[in-house]
Amino acid sequence: MDARKRGRPEAAASHNSNGGFKRSKQEMESISTGLGSKSKPCTKFFSTSGCPFGDNCHFLHYVPGGYNAAAQMTNLRPPVSQVSRNMQGSGGPGGRFSGRGDPGSGPVSIFGASTSKISVDASLAGAIIGKGGIHSKQICRETGAKLSIKDHERDPNLKIIELEGTFEQINVASGMVRELIGRLGSVKKPQGIGGPEGKPHPGSNYKTKICDRYSKGNCTYGDRCHFAHGESELRRSGIA
């Protein structure tokens, strides 16, 4: 009896809790039908547990096309990417994340969240928020991003709109904010920045500083920017 045990290495890897031998369904199929013999993919080998039989296994450990091909032949689950595993443990009740979000459960913390900042004229901050927060709430509700307005670190005439969320959420929210700024700027231009042609009043600080974003090539305001886009637009404070 001991000799038979030593002659079958696969038996040693398949002890059950009662001290006997336990064969997998796949192994029993190969013995009973004789169809194993490297004719089917090994489901254990292509699983997270791995195959304990190694070279003695009766099933294929290599299938052209890899896991996807083996999955189609044996009805295995599709592979779970590492990003999906990270997201499963990062948000929502019970540490699960569905990828769609539950509209009734509020915002979900999402793997890979980041922030983006937009500089705006301080006079536009209140209008961007809107009466009772109507504009900021709409942006947050439609995009899922968080929006907050903070003081500018260096210029008291500016405010910082900070957006927090995923790259896609921030991208959509930024577009909505800039569209809102464009509408507000066109309404305020006759009163806030000058005459009918949009020229600044002598006492304003319009175009008195070089635009940092323009120097870096990422200013999104274009002609609406309050800062100079080059030396040709730069003017001294108090001079029209």
Swiss-Prot record:
Presence of keyword Acetylation: no
Residue spans of biased composition, Gly residues class: 89-104
Gene3D superfamilies for this protein: K Homology domain, type 1, Zinc finger, CCCH-type
SUPFAM superfamilies listed in its UniProt record: CCCH zinc finger, Eukaryotic type KH-domain (KH-domain type I)
GO cellular component terms given for this protein: nucleus
Keyword terms: DNA-binding, Metal-binding, Repeat, RNA-binding, Zinc, Zinc-finger
GO molecular function, one term: DNA-binding transcription factor activity
Region (Disordered): 1-37, 81-106
Pfam families per the UniProt record, alphabetical: KH_1, zf-CCCH
Location of the KH domain: 113-177
C3H1-type zinc finger segments: 36-64, 205-232
GO BP annotation list: positive regulation of leaf senescence; regulation of DNA-templated transcription; regulation of photoperiodism, flowering
Domain of life: Eukaryota
Name of the protein in question: Zinc finger CCCH domain-containing protein 52
